[in-house]
Amino acid sequence: MKKLSILVIALCMACGSASAQQALFGGQMPLSPEIHADKTVTFRCMAPNAQKVQITGDFLPTRKMDTPMGQFDAPGVAELTKDEKGVWSYTTTSPLSPELYSYTMMVDGASVTDHLNVYTVRDINNVSNIFLVDGGKADLYKVNKVPHGTVSKVWYEDAKAGITRRMTVYTPAGYETSKEKYPVLYLLHGIGGDEEAWMDLGRASQILDNLIAQGKAKPMIVVMTNGNISQEAAPGYTSEGFIVPTLGLPKTMEGSFEVSFPEVVKFIDARYRTLANSQNRAIAGLSMGGFHSLYISINNPKTFGYVGLFSAAIGKEQKSGGANEYIYDNLDKKLADLFAAKPKLFWIGIGNSDFLYKDNTAFREKLTQKGYPFTYMETDGGHIWRNWRIYLSEYVQKIFK
């Protein structure tokens, strides 16, 4: 009885607190973001004592930003205005196209998330809010009323790395109740990412669920590894505890991950009901993951029947002299070996303002000169998730057919 009384008091206090907050705004908390019928969007921020509030996000016109890695298209910035209640707001000047968007706010120069929007994603060490304007391709990124696959976090012993590591595995709807064997796509993230990236930022499970339900993609297993060979798992899920996510981890792009990858394939073939041959095995990745996909496939020319490079890093400018850097030697000969094995698809996608565009153009020219067949897709924009979701959506409709 005493416990019940305490619970009732606690609930009353919580309700009173919520009511007090709502009373400040006429009984209703501000909504942010608010997607209007015409697909303009209003963002709001409760900061009555702030002097300046801004918003930055990929729904705004881009601005050029120079970085050590090249020139990037950075999200634009817009100013919010304050009303008499201390609520700041900004409404887009035109309707937004269907897409999954991300944004953050800046209150007196400090970057913050939108406290009125609980939906966030992490990209390296940046946390952003997200919202979706539905319709068109964005409907692939939604959870729709279709059969859903299962997403598992799977630990495995990485003998090459000498540690236990984690991967994310998607199995299609019906996997658990059937005896059928399935093809496998190995889907790799970019630098600074991890085994969470394609699920959280790339909407991989939603894309697969929807395209499989529409009959546009074959049911498949999707394996999303952690491409940082020195890392057990994504930050917060390792024995190191709540570490700060960072770029430039040890052994990044020096061959160790590529050398270890055949063990991942063996593990998946042993643990899951797979069609264990090259015609039912695909690999693809974005940026560093495209780099990994290229060098894993050319060093194992009979392993993958489908190769996808999404805004891929192509060449390695500097070598550290490590024992595994032979992986990057003899590119021309290894490409010849790969195409001699007759892959069913070699797919390349990149944005026309991507800082890796020139490298990809030179690589495509090499393939053309050698007479190697490939499929190419060019989109607007730069080195961004908006493009990589498109590439994944296109690629999975072409493999295993």
Predicted segments — roles?
Residues 1-23:
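Bacterial Sec-dependent N-terminal signal peptides
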Residues 35-401:
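Non-catalytic cap/lid and distal C-terminal segments of serine-dependent acyl enzymes
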Residues 1, 22-24, 29, 174-175, ...:
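Hydrophobic alpha-helical segments, principally membrane-spanning helices and signal/leader peptides
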Residues 21-42:
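N-terminal edge beta-strand
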